[in-house]
Amino acid sequence: MNDIMGSTDGYEELPYIKYRKVVADMVELASMKHQMKGKMEVDVTLAREKLRLYKARTGETQSFTAWFVKCVAQAVSENKQIHGLRKGKKIIIFNDVDVLIMIEKMMGKDLVALPYVVRKADKKDIKEVQTEIRAAQKHDLNNPSIMIGSKSWLMDLYPHLPKQVRMLVCKVISRNPHHIKANTGTISVSSIGMIGKVNGWISPISPLPLSFAVCGITKKPGVVEDRIEIREQVALAFAVDHDLIDGAQVTRFLSRLTELMEDGFSLE
């Protein structure tokens, strides 16, 4: 042990990049929420087949993540209270559905996941959502920001502030739903399973009223018209702000989301 502690050959020192401060603050804010958390599986056999047929027909790949964002946005647009935000004695429910996603980028020598908000995702088709995500992935980080597409000086200054000041900024923003929506949207989606194979669930951590983690897609036996068939199932984990919405409303939302996904909603 002494040899390891006394020699640089026994360990490696890495810089604590500024973006990790933002993540730590968001986790701390999320820990203050009273969230309902759950796990589910959805049959995406038809959707995956449509994605494969589209590629065979056009030579272009449609993104599963973009499609999932579209499905979530559609389900939320039909159950808007699910993404409501509290302001004092009122709940503010926005007409537009803004979805925050995480996009991996190189920041210097470090690979980091940076947030990007797809605005009005409910009013865009899959191709528009995908094009926007692809553009964000190619976004130039020569002048790095902690949020892709953000032009806010506060967002760039934020990680350089002392912890007490950062948390004060967060509390001020969190009291105003319009500020929350402008900075982070109202829903977060993390596509963990699109990065690597994940046979299981990883729960999302977010202070937003609704968050999803898209985990792995696996083949499992399922029942279709009383027949056992091999089906493709995607594992989803979710968290909902219980202070703002009840279980029955969450169930209706998840039921609609399941219908959209099983039907391959909006896929050609």
How should these model regions be labeled?
Residues 1-268:
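C-terminal catalytic/motor cores of large multi-domain enzyme assemblies
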